[in-house]
Amino acid sequence: MADEFPFEISPMFEGERVRKEGMFVELGGPKSLGLELVRAADMDAIEDDKVTIIGPDLKDMEEGKTYPWAMIFNIGGELVEPDLESVVERRVHDFINYCQGIMHLNQRYDVWMRVSKDTAAKMDSFEPFGKAVMMLFKTELPFIEKMQVTFYTDKDEVEKQMETAKEIFKARDARTKDLHDEDVEVFYGCTLCQSFAPTNVCVVSPDRISLCGAINWFDGRAAAKVDPEGPQFEIAKGDLIDAVTGEYTGVNEIAKKLSSGEFDKIKLHSFFDCPHTSCGCFEVVGFYIPEVDGIGWVDREYQGMAPNGIGFSTMAGQTGGGKQIVGFLGIGVNYFYSPKFIQADGGWNRVVWLPSKLKEKIDEAIPADLKDKIATENDASDIESLKAFLQEKNHPVVATWAAAEEEEEEEEEEEEVAVAAAPMMMPAAGFQMPAMPMMSGGSSGGIKLTFKNAKITIDRMIISEKKEKK
C-alpha cells in the first residue's frame, strides 16, 4: 500500500510490538507525556495534508531516548461535526499501527509510541509518517475531506496542549451524565482492540464508557451512523436479565459471537461474576484484596506499588488480553462517575485504596462520606497498614470482617463435629496417616482434628492406638 512512503503500510502490521532492544525512540508512555486529540475545524482553516513539527524532529532525536509527544489532528468536511471528534480520534490507534515499525498504544492523554530502528533508518522526519496516517484516514473515512496534523515534541508545548485537551475530554465525558442504561434501546460495541486482544468484547452503554475512556454512548452512536461497517456498531440490548449486575440477553449474544464462544455472559456492572472483558487499553485496573474484602484501583500514571505489592504494568499484564479475570477488572476513568459503578459488588462501599493523584482527579465521583475512608499510598503501603487504616476510619468493609470471622468459626465447629461423629475407619485415599499419640490412662482428652478451608479426597483412613511391644 502506498509506495511513496519509506515504510510498508498494511493492516497486517496491527499488533506488531516494538521491543526495547529494537527501539530507536520512545514517544510518550509511562516515562513521559503522550497525547492525541482530533478537532473539527472549518474547511478554510485547514491546509490539506500539512504536517507541522514543533520541537525536535526524528533526525534530531537520540537513539534509545524517550520524548514527550502530542498529536493534534484538524479535520474538515461537509459531514464533519464535533460529535465525530472522539470517533476519529479512536481510529488513530488503528492507522498508526498499520505503519510498519511504529507501535501505538493507549489513547487520549496516555499515548505510548515507539519507532523501530529499522523504520528510523528509512526516514529522518515525522513528516512522511504524518502524511501516511492522514492518507489512511481519508481513505477509510471519506467524510473527512481535509486534514492537517501538528506533532509536538517540545516539553513545554506538550504540557500546554495536554492542559487544553484534558478540559476537552472532561466536557465530552459529561454529556452522558443524565442518560442511563434503562433510557435507551441499544448499546454500542467496539472491536478496535481486538488486534491486541482477540477475544475482547467492549460494550459501551450510557452508564459504562469504553475501557479506553475514549468512546461514550454518544460517540458510539455517531460512529455507527457515519461508518456502519466500522469497528463501532449497534448492540440491541435485548431483555433485561438482572438490573443490578447489568446483564442483558443482547449483550450476552454479542459476547459469545465476538469472543468466538469463549464467553457467553458479560455483566456490565459486576466485578466478580462474569465481569466485562479487559483489553489492554484500559485506563485503570481494579484488583481484589481478599485480606480486607475490598477493591483497590490503580491507573497508568501511578508508578509505585499497590498494597498487594504489585504495580500497574504487572496487573495490566495479568488483566488484559480480552479475558474475564475474576479479581481484576479494567475500566475507563469515567466509569467511576457512573451511578451503576460495580453496583453488583458494593459500588463505592467496596473501594478501599486509590493512588492519591487518581483520588484527587475523581474527587467529585467519590461519595462525601467515603472520601476520608479510602486510603492512598500516603496512608497504606501494604496490607497490614491498609487494615489498620480501614479500621481506624471505620470503612464499610470492616463490618464484613466480623461476619466473615463468625462464619469461619461456625464452619470450623461443623468440621469438628463431623470429625468427631465419623467412624474410626472409613473409605480413604490410599495412604495411611502416621500413628498419632493417644492420651493414656484415664484421660478423657481424646483427639481433636480441625480442618480449615481444606479439600481432602480420602480413600481409606486408619486411626489406631499404637500398642507397645511386649
UniProtKB/Swiss-Prot annotation:
Protein name according to UniProt: Acetyl-CoA decarbonylase/synthase complex subunit beta 2
This enzyme's EC code(s): 2.3.1.169
Family: Belongs to the CdhC family.
GO BP, one annotated term: methanogenesis, from acetate
The record's free-text note on cofactor binding: Binds 1 [Ni-Fe-S] cluster.
Keywords, alphabetical: Acyltransferase, Iron, Iron-sulfur, Metal-binding, Methanogenesis, Nickel, Transferase
Subunit relationships: Monomer. The ACDS complex is made up of alpha, epsilon, beta, gamma and delta chains with a probable stoichiometry of (alpha(2)epsilon(2))(4)-beta(8)-(gamma(1)delta(1))(8) (Potential).
Catalytic class of the enzyme: transferase
Pathway where this protein functions: One-carbon metabolism; methanogenesis from acetate
Source species taxonomy: Archaea, Methanobacteriati, Methanobacteriota, Stenosarchaea group, Methanomicrobia
UniProt cross-references to InterPro entries, sorted A to Z: ACS_CODH_B_C (IPR045822), CO_DH/Ac-CoA_synth_bsu (IPR004461), CO_DH/Ac-CoA_synth_bsu_3_sf (IPR038571), CO_DH/Ac-CoA_synth_bsu_arc (IPR023432), Prismane-like_sf (IPR011254)
Catalytic activity: Co(I)-[corrinoid Fe-S protein] + acetyl-CoA + H(+) = methyl-Co(III)-[corrinoid Fe-S protein] + CO + CoA
